[in-house]
């Protein structure tokens, strides 16, 4: 607190789960997407650079993180990370199945629900321009 940090108290298991969903899994997803782009022989590096939009650029920014640190994070918090990755894999499989079946309603409902979540985060005061995203204490 003396350094301006917001201190939150939670038990270790809950902390690990929160960080797995908000930090660890997004890093693994970013590493994976950048790796897939690199491994996809039919897409050249020039095309990846020329056609990448903000989302992919964010993946490359995240994937540029320190590999030693992230290896250690994943191995230290493997239980929570594996739980979140399992849930992510299930959701991804459901979306894959909806695309395969041409189920536009399922896709729309999923995208609409997740868009509403993002909007509620913004409505709750997240400021994407602020260095700390406008976060105060969770209790505020």
Q: Across the structure, where does each feature detected by a protein language model lie?
A:
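Internal alpha-helical scaffold of NAD(P)-dependent oxidoreductase catalytic cores
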Residues: 1-61
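Generic structural signal for well-ordered, non-transmembrane alpha-helical segments
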Residues: 8, 23, 27, 86, ...
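Long, hydrophobic, amphipathic alpha-helical segments used as structural scaffolds
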Residues: 33, 37-40, 96-103, 122-125, ...
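Intrinsic disorder/low-complexity signal
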Residues: 37, 57, 90, 138-139
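Interdomain hinge/lid region at the active-site interface
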Residues: 45-114
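Long, positively charged, glycine-interspersed low-complexity recognition regions
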Residues: 116-140
């Amino acid at each position: 607190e003396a350094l301006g940090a917001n201190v939150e108290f939670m038990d270790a298991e809950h902390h690990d789960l929160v960080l797995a969903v908000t930090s660890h899994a997004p890093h693994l997803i970013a590493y994976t997407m950048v790796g897939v782009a690199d491994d996809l022989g039919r897409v050249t590096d020039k095309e990846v650079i020329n056609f990448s939009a903000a989302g992919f650029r964010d993946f490359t920014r995240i994937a540029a993180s320190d590999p030693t640190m992230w290896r250690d994070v994943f191995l230290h918090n493997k239980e929570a990370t594996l739980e979140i990755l399992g849930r992510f894999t299930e959701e991804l499989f459901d979306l894959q199945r909806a695309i395969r079946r041409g189920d536009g309603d399922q896709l729309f409902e999923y995208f609409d629900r997740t868009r509403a979540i993002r909007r509620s985060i913004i409505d709750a005061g997240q400021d994407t321009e602020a260095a700390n995203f406008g976060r105060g204490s969770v209790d505020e």
